[in-house]
Amino acid sequence: RDRYIRTHYGNKMTEEQWKKYATETFTGFDTDETMCRLSCMNLMLHSVTNPQLNKQDSVSKDYMVKDTYDLILANPPFKGTLNKENISESLSAITSTTKTELLFVALFIRLLRVGGRCACIVPDGVLFGSSKAHKNLRKELVENQYLEGVISMPSGVFKPYACLLYTSDA
């Protein structure tokens, strides 16, 4: 990533833009503190001097959305379902479900700025599930967001997962 940006934008970015890139650009969330530390170390090895990685459950009601983002890249965990009383109300407004795969997609919709882009790995069920919650979330993506594409992964890569790409229009 760093090499790509330096190669393609190195002479186009001011010193102030480089400083912002290294100190303010990267934010992440995980419930596992070890994963936060490993991710932080990886980013620092790639010239990101101040990554904002936080240990928190971003779909729980304890998480309050404060910021919105231009770009979201995600491979969230999908552990089945959550207790309804533990789910963030802002996510319940987008999808009425306890399934984590749908809650994370709803979270990404909530976190994107207008015109923002998201690429996330999701189970095939998000695309083909027949429940009311699955259908409503797909309708949200098609009618209120800009769904650029769906990439089906080759067998064994993230089986049975696909990659969902969309841009926020809302």
Question: Each predicted region: which residue ranges?
Answer:
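Conserved S-adenosyl-L-methionine
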Residues: 1-74, 79-81, 90, 98, ...
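Residue-level detector of family-conserved "landmark" positions at structurally sensitive sites
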Residues: 53, 83, 150-152
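Short glycine/proline-enriched turns and hinge-like loops at secondary-structure junctions
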Residues: 65-66, 160-164
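Short amphipathic alpha-helical segments
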Residues: 84-87, 132-133
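Phosphate-binding chemistry for phosphorylated carbohydrates and sugar-nucleotides
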Residues: 94
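Conserved Class I SAM-dependent methyltransferase catalytic core
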Residues: 98-158, 162
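Conserved small/polar residues in nucleotide/adenosyl-binding loops
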Residues: 166-170
